[in-house]
Design a protein with these regions (language model features):
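Active-site beta3 strand of CheY-like receiver
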Residues: 44-50
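Receiver (REC) domain active-site loop signature in two-component systems and cognate sites
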Residues: 55
Length: 126
């Protein structure tokens, strides 16, 4: 079981996340922007952060940069959720410390599988 912070401004995607994660043992927190997500992350560090890129107040890249700038948090893997993956995007994701990404639309199973993959990889790191 892992604690996961999700940052997503689209209500429909938040509902999909809730449905997808309901069948798991993970504890999830949903936030509508990166600023709220960062506040939650600073209060209690999760095992994984899943964030949309384009959100009001603080987007995914700014959130990732803020997390990685904090020594107590910079070990937390971050997965970006994006509406499309264009040429060069994967490199940009890496520049902002992404452990992975998933493109919208995604299935609940694809989301769960990617999350499990990233949590397993993070737990196996020395």
């Amino acid at each position: 079981m892992a604690r996961i912070v999700f940052c997503e401004d689209e209500e429909q995607i938040r509902k999909l996340i809730e449905v997808a994660m309901r069948s798991t043992a993970h504890t999830i927190e949903l936030h509508v922007n990166g600023r709220e997500g960062l506040e939650a992350i600073e209060r209690e560090a999760p095992e994984l952060i899943v964030t949309d890129l384009a959100m009001p107040e603080m987007g995914g890249f700014a959130l990732a940069d803020a997390v990685h700038a904090r020594p107590a948090l910079n070990h937390i893997p971050i997965m970006f959720v994006t509406a499309s993956v264009q040429r060069g995007d994967v490199a940009r994701f890496g520049e902002h410390g992404a452990a992975g990404y998933i493109a919208k639309p995604f299935s609940p199973r694809a989301l769960r599988d990617k999350i499990d993959e990233l949590i397993t990889a993070a737990r196996e790191k020395p």
